[in-house]
Amino acid sequence: VYVTGSNSKFLSSDIVTEFRGRGDEIRIYPLSFAEFYSVCEGDYDDAWDDYMIYGGLPQVVGLQSERQKADYLKNIFANVYLKDVIERNKIQNVDEIGILVDVLASAIGAPTNPSKIANTFASERQMSYTNKTISNHIDYLADAFLISKANRYDIKGRKYIGANLKYYFTDPGLRNARLNFRQQEPTNIMENIVYNELLIRGYNVDVGVVQIFDKDKEGKRVRKQLEVDFVVNQGNQRYYIQVAYDMTSEEKQTQEFNSLRNIPDSFKKVVIVNGSKKPWRNDEGFVI
């Protein structure tokens, strides 16, 4: 027996509670890029560009024009996803959560927290939006399977850092539709897609932090924090992953590699770069 329901009435968490010990949750994601490409026709690179803009909701694949795809995504976001969240949780101030979604969509992959978001509302929009309300609204969006949260993990300290989290959209097309397809940021969108792909493959995904000591311009010893895009775990397997849309400059290579160089263990280190070249290992053993 398979049990499903509208987000406005019946979330997966409700199913788990209702059928505790008598069933398992099966999470259905939008199409991965591999699934998307397997059913669409045409050039691989064109399909990738299309996926980055319009995402992998199954209905999108069958639509022909860009206008049809954009209209469909805008409509389903406003009249299904967001409406379900508002109705289920009896949200009175619709403007608040609407703007919150815009803020999260504009900053996918950027570390943030309710306090920072509240300050943004106060300074830029002159709106009072409490930390608790923001936190609750973010949870509602995650429960509705619209966004996902990634915790930050101190790799050397082997502990979670509770301050800032990263938020990603479960489908890049929905994210782009919410912003009216204005902010086409390939680096951040690609990072979002990689995050979703890792979840689809069953991995536990965190954001990594590496603490190092370096010297500032005056030669003083200072503590610095380097970021690893993803710390990926499954059983006894672990991977450290960096995502780079373009890594042609030496500065960008140094930025991506430096975090991996400072990880004091031998788990596999991977750099995912935009393009369809075969994987290879550099002199440091990083898979690119």
Task: Place the predicted regions along the sequence by residue.
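Conserved nucleotide-sensing/catalytic segment adjacent to the nucleotide-binding pocket
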Residues: 1-2
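Short, locally clustered residues in the helix-turn-helix/winged-helix DNA-binding domain
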Residues: 102-106, 122, 199
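A cross-kingdom feature that marks ATP-driven nucleic-acid transaction machinery
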Residues: 133-288
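Short hinge/gating elements
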Residues: 83-87, 119-124, 174-184
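Short, positively charged loop/turn segments that connect secondary-structure elements
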Residues: 122-133
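Short acidic, hydrophobic short linear motifs in intrinsically disordered regions
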Residues: 109-121
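Interdomain motor-coupling "hinge/lid" segment immediately C-terminal to the ATP-binding subdomain
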Residues: 6-8, 12-111
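Hydrophobic (often cysteine-bearing) scaffold residues that line and stabilize catalytic clefts
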Residues: 69, 73, 93, 130, ...
